[in-house]
Amino acid sequence: MSLKLIFEIDWLKTLRFNFHYFPLRQAVRIPAYVYWNTSFVEMGGNVHLNCPAKAGLLRIGPHAIGIKDRKTRTLWQVMGGVEVDGSVHLGRGCKVCEEKGALLKIGEHFHVTGDTTIVCKKSVSFGKDCLLSWDVMVMDTDFHHIYGNCEEVNKPRSIAVGNHVWIGMGVTILKGVKICDDVVVSANSSITKNLDESHCVYGGVGRGVEILKRDIDWKR
């Protein structure tokens, strides 16, 4: 471990997180690193590793890119379940907000650059090898309630993102959306419907989202 990394990690919060969420045999391996400027708003629910516990497997709040302020605060507000399948990088400024009874599933090789918000009231899942740029919003709820004929018409609905998906800067993904494997979502898009065709670049807002290019692949 480099000297720079040693000083970037908040070791008190790191120890607190690991020994709060993981059984002793996993916690002693320090599978989660918590970096400076990370706030624990809520440390409820549970975090489950579906893979061997390795040091630094889950990284919360590392500084990733120079154009973002190092003073930006990362927030962890979790009261539901979190499942981790492999390495996870939640860059500085990320906000994870999960309500009691909800489930957040994260596949291996998951990377968020920073300043991204994930709001989970029911279920949000990401497949393996997903990349999220900065200022992304993923939200499976409208927070407030809308009624028609005395029935709620905007209940939370699950979000499912497939494998090898790249979400561009400033994208919003709203409740009920399913995104298939091998997709790129272009910057500043607002996704409210399913993206069903693989190896495509999608872009647009709401019902205007369309395929911008087919037969593509992408690499980090």
State what each model feature region is.
Residues 78-80, 157, 175:
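Short, conserved secondary-structure segments in the cores of folded domains
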Residues 142, 146-153:
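Short, flexible helix-coil linker/hinge segments at the edges of structured domains or between repeats
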Residues 143-144, 189-190, 196-197:
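Flexible glycine-rich beta->alpha loop in the catalytic core of nucleotide-sugar glycosyltransferases
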Residues 151, 191-192:
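Short secondary-structure boundary/capping segments
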Residues 190-191, 207:
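Conserved sequence/active-site signature of Rossmann-fold short-chain dehydrogenase/reductase
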